[in-house]
Amino acid sequence: MNRFSKTQIYLHWITLLFVAITYAAMELRGWFPKGSSTYLLMRETHYNAGIFVWVLMFSRLIIKHRYSDPSIVPPPPAWQMKAASLMHIMLYITFLALPLLGIALMAYSGKSWSFLGFNVSPFVTPNSEIKALIKNIHETWANIGYFLIAAHAGAALFHHYIQKDNTLLRMMPRRK
């Protein structure tokens, strides 16, 4: 086996799409007046896409344990394999934790929010101090997420163009 399964490949790229939408919606939100319809659309898009990221990452975690990883040919040094393993752990933790922190942030704000058009009421007692702490963690960790994404993509490109192994090709969809 020299590639990940079709399911793993699909989930990888759809996760990237939803991560990009989540980040873009939050960044673009600031371009619009607070409370405007576009601002609110960007905010709701951020919430909804973030929850989809959690669902996708959780699904990927389950599926990852059903399949073995395809071999990298030629094999990289052991330290690179350890670094890759650590990077994947950090990516999974990040994109499983960020949506949960976002949900907690909304809950502690005391405001209702919408998920796919369904109203979600706060389920904890509002607390501005806890909200501020969670917001700080959420935003800091999201900024770290930018670095993790760049490092992950950079490593894949390094393996493809410099080391000339099949690291990147293992996760690419097949050409028809």
From Swiss-Prot:
Residues spanning the membrane: 8-28, 46-63, 86-106, 142-162
A GO biological-process term: respiratory electron transport chain
GO cellular component: plasma membrane
Cofactor binding summary note: Binds 2 heme b (iron-protoporphyrin IX) groups per molecule.
Compartments, as annotated in UniProt: Cell inner membrane
Superkingdom as given in the UniProt entry: Bacteria
Protein name listed in UniProt: Cytochrome b561 homolog 1
Source organism of this protein record: Escherichia coli (strain K12)
Source organism phylogeny: Bacteria, Pseudomonadati, Pseudomonadota, Gammaproteobacteria, Enterobacterales
